[in-house]
Amino acid sequence: MIDYGKAGLAVIGMGWIGEYMVPCYERLLGNGYESRILAVKATDRRLEELRKRYGFEIMAGDCLERLKALRPAFLVLSVRPYEMAGVVEGTVKPYIGFLRNQGAPMPLIISFAPSPRPEWYTQVLGEDVRTVCVLPAMETSIGGVDVYSLASSQVTYDQGIPLAEGHREAVGRFLEPLGKVLWCTPEESMALLSMNITYHMLYLLCFALEGHYGAGGCARAAGILYALNCGRLGRPGLVKPVAEPEEADKRQLAWLEKGWYEGAFDFAAGHGRLPDGAPSSNVRVLAPQAFELHLLSLQLESRQFLEEKLKDHATPGGMTEKAVKEFKRLWEEVQGGAHGCRIPLKGSGSMAYDISYRLAEQVYQRGISLERG
């Protein structure tokens, strides 16, 4: 059993994700958690600011000797995917070797990089080390509205190496501030992520529709799609649309809502099957929540804020950047190569479905290529 009141935790990578997860560190370790945390940054930028803000030890540079002294029960890795191999080979592997020579217990490693896969950590660190890879829920509040009930984090691990006793409980406790925990196979997690990123492109759909509706048109388009989706799926919805859509507006965009939702959903359901071939129940949990969350953002946040948010997510070479490029290309393709992305007010559900499905597929393939390096 893990004694959370005495356990330590180290965070390698105190950037955006490292800071975002601070409530999770507190929930996991409990009272007095500040005295049992070590956070590590690559440089000393903002070092003093972060120390004053959080009140726990934060250092810059090589942390191997501090890890040996602290011997944390939990080791959180929140560096960028392209940095992960260097951190694991240069710091984590030597630390694990030290523990092994000492006959000391191994930490549970929690990685926040979407790649590499959990099996890679097993190959590099050994079968006595357990690693979980987490795609955390990124929002529990939007525009002042509590969306905790819609938030879900995806967790994967090496399916060939069962988690040790207490690890599932520890992960659930750790992620509790961020909503539900969905345990997935690596393949399923990638398919669900591809679906979610495709739903993220609702931003671009509503941006493109803004011209049809005038001032506030982006939020209005999102409100119409939101009302359609909640009504079709029989969900109450967290908030009323910005303006209650007229029936004519709903008829105008019904094809787009249904096709966009079902295309990415069917891709994830088909590519996220369990090892026995059965469809995963996680897709039915995540899809309506993700669709609603993105449409809520469009109704409750400014377009400028959302454009910056999308830009931040679309890191060079990543899956979201791929989605943005393919979104524009696929719409231009169905419009006969017309320059620019114009979303028609009239269309067919099959057209929206086809673009959504193909977009999820392209994003998925980018994710697989990133996993393979």
Q: Language-model segments: which ranges?
A:
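A charged, well-structured terminal subsegment
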Residues: I161-T185, K311, M319-F327
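Active-site loop-to-helix "anion-binding N-cap" substructures in soluble metabolic enzymes
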Residues: L204
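Rossmann-like NAD(P)(H) cofactor-binding subdomain of soluble oxidoreductases
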Residues: M21, Y54, I58-A170
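NAD(P)+-binding Rossmann beta1-loop-alpha1 motif at the extreme N-terminus of oxidoreductases
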Residues: M1-F74, F174-P177, G211-G217, G270-D276
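Small-residue helix-packing motif on alpha-helices
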Residues: I37, L47, L67, M84, ...
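Structured catalytic cores of enzymes that bind and process phosphorylated ligands/cofactors
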Residues: M14, S189-L192, A314
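NAD(P)-dependent Rossmann-like dehydrogenase/reductase catalytic/cofactor-binding core
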Residues: M1-A7, A227-G373
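Conserved Rossmann-fold dehydrogenase catalytic segment
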Residues: T140-S141, E176-M201, G214-E257, P279, ...
